[in-house]
A protein has these predicted regions:
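Ankyrin-repeat boundary/"N-cap" motif
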Residues: 28-34, 57-63, 90-96, 123-130, ...
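Bacterial N-terminal signal peptides
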Residues: 11-22
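Ankyrin repeat domain, specifically the short helix-to-loop turn at the C-terminus of the second helix
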Residues: 48-53, 78-86, 111-119, 145-153, ...
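N-terminal secretory signal peptides that target proteins for export/translocation
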Residues: 1-8
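Conserved ankyrin/ankyrin-like repeat signature
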Residues: 43, 75-76, 108-109, 142-143, ...
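N-terminal segments that cap or nucleate solenoid repeat domains
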Residues: 26-67
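Ankyrin repeat A-helix N-terminal signature
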Residues: 34-38, 67-73, 100-106, 134-140, ...
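Leucine-rich solenoid repeat scaffolds
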Residues: 468-527
């Protein structure tokens, strides 16, 4: 046993000494790289005089020439190249001196490396990025010119996203770089790779597919971008003008079907959109979700404000809307969909039939009048048979979330649609009436107007608008229930009580002998707890305080009409 331990100790000692020796040899062998890393030209010169290996790499694979390129030290680079430095050397991550020079946008360093044998078209990353692409990102035209004159391919695509050097210049807003590339023959209508919705970026192991040439698009797909769509997305008017003048296709569509015009409007870049309309962009081209440029402009005029959308506070697309209508935009183009951004933010479904319905939902009186003047049909129904009146009255409107005009203006919009023939007692496919929509919104003057116009206080919905979600129930509800908050459209079961609206409707129901038939259990939010509340005499506040919430489903034992135990 002792002999075995002694042998093991000797072996460990020998191994340790070998490692120390190897480390010392490594340190001694990287004198040139170490000196270059420090930027010490004298030390580099001295090491080379001692015949130190000019290509010896540090532990990460960096050579002296890498450090010279990184530091943009031309004198040191010349010295190393004369001593035989390999310009194609790669670090362990695959980085070459040319990649570092291109990232810096150093024309002189790029020129030195190219003359020493570097390939201007070599893929410098695993994704196939070239020096021209990297230089384009810096915007330094002298660096680009050196690469182009050395034979750099201006239309080469990196292999992951399929982008070109021109796309990189456009995305970064480098106008002069874009001009140089276009002058050198860059394709202004080149496309990036198409990314199917099921193969979207951000999912592990999934990458864009090869660029497509067929016109098929799909909802929620991405990619398939052109330099012009990138300029539209970034809001770069000058860049967009350069590309249009160079012959870019103004109607090319991205993977989700958006044209540059739609993409500009979607991002609030109305100056670019105006330029594209002037350039004969198709103002009626719908994307894969059926949204037209006109709809996006109407939506953005009244879109929910968020910190990451500062332009929503200041920019007004109304002049653009007028320009698109003048250019032939169809105000009756059927959309029958909900904007994706609204769905992703947790807002309930509200299906907009046309741009007019979106304007009605926001109670944007000026915009509603403009669209009507230009031929918008006030009687078009959504796919759920919802009317313009219901949208204007407050269908699915969430206070504190949705952006709309003041109640006084909303009342004027409601009156307008009633005068145009919208039925005050129309039931949509969920049984919801305009009065229920108004009760959800909670404006007493609007409710009063609809009651005076003949709205039915005894109406019942079909109990299926939310399928038990959002704090609602599956029991048919009355208009007053929407004011109480039972028919809420608010996510996370938040309760919004409109006490004045409840009082007004209760008064009329009492005068007209209309019974409030909704069960106690439903009024208390699915929960038949030990707390007893008589919904026929209790105030809405007392009812709500007694509510116990079930999130997204019914409490066990409560089914169908949610009858109270």
């Amino acid at each position: 046993m002792r002999q075995r331990d002694a042998v093991r100790q000797i072996a460990c000692s020998v191994l340790f000494m070998l490692l120390i020796g190897a480390a010392a040899a490594q340190a001694a062998g990287t004198d040139v790289a170490d000196a270059a890393r420090r930027g010490d030209r004298d030390a580099v010169r001295a090491a080379l005089a001692r015949k130190a290996d000019v290509n010896a790499a540090q532990i990460d694979g960096s050579t002296a020439l890498h450090w010279a390129a990184e530091r943009d030290d031309l004198e040191m680079a010349d010295q190393l190249i004369r001593a035989g430095a390999r310009v194609t050397a790669r670090t362990r991550e695959g980085v070459t001196p040319l990649q570092l020079a291109a990232t810096n946008g150093s024309a002189s360093m790029i020129d030195r490396l190219l003359k020493a044998g570097a390939d201007p078209n070599a893929p410098l990353t695993a994704g196939g990025d070239t020096a021209l692409m990297m230089a384009a990102r810096t915007g330094k035209t002298d660096a680009l010119r050196v690469l182009v004159e050395a034979g750099g391919n201006v239309n080469a695509k990196e292999t992951w996203g399929g982008t070109t050097a021109l796309m990189w210049a456009v995305s970064e807003g480098h106008v002069d770089a874009a001009k140089l590339l276009i002058g050198a023959g860059a394709d202004v209508s080149a496309r990036s790779n198409y990314v199917a919705a099921a193969n979207g970026r951000g999912f592990e192991g999934r990458t864009p597919v090869a660029s497509r040439t067929d016109p098929k698009t799909e909802e929620f797909a991405s990619g398939w971008l052109t330099p012009l769509t990138l300029a539209a997305r970034e809001g770069d008017v000058e860049m967009a003008r350069i590309l249009v003048n160079a012959g870019a296709d103004v109607n090319a569509v991205a993977g989700d079907g958006k044209t540059a015009l739609a993409l500009a409007i979607f991002n609030g870049n109305y100056d670019v959109a105006s330029l594209l309309v002037d350039s004969k962009a198709d103002v009626n081209k719908a994307d894969a979700q059926r949204f037209t440029p006109l709809f996006y402009a109407v939506d953005r005029r009244n879109m929910e404000t968020a910190p990451n959308f500062p332009w929503m506070v200041t920019a007004d697309p109304m002049p653009l809307i007028r320009k698109m209508l003048d250019a032939g935009a169809n105000p009756n183009a059927l959309v029958n969909n909900t904007p994706r951004a609204r769905m992703r933010e947790g807002s309930p479904r509200i299906v907009f039939a046309t741009a007019l319905m979106r304007a009605a939902f926001a109670a944007d009186l000026d915009l509603v009048k403009l669209l009507l003047e230009r031929g918008a049909d006030p009687k078009i129904l959504s796919r759920d048979n919802e009317t313009m009146l219901s949208a204007a009255a407050g269908l699915a409107f969430i206070h504190g979330y949705h952006r709309g005009k003041p109640p006084e203006e909303r009342l004027q919009v409601v009156k307008l649609f009633v005068e145009l023939g919208n039925d005050v007692n129309w039931h949509d496919d969920y049984g919801i009436t305009p009065l229920m929509a108004a009760a959800n919104y909670g404006s007493v003057p609007i409710i009063q107007y609809l009651i005076d116009a003949g709205a039915d206080l005894s109406a019942h919905d079909l109990g299926k608008k939310n399928d038990g979600a959002f704090g609602s129930s599956n029991e048919p509800l009355m208009p007053i229930d929407y004011a109480i908050g039972v028919g809420t459209f608010v996510p996370n079961n938040a309760v919004i009580i409109h006490q004045d609206a409840v009082d007004l409707m209760a008064k009329y129901m009492k005068e007209r002998g209309i019974a409030h038939t909704t069960s106690e259990c439903t009024l208390r939010g699915f929960s038949c707890s030990q707390v007893k509340v008589d919904p026929k005499v209790a105030t809405p506040g007392e009812i709500v305080r007694a509510r116990k919430f079930a999130t997204g489903h019914q409490i066990e034992g409560l089914t169908g009409g949610l009858e109270a135990k």
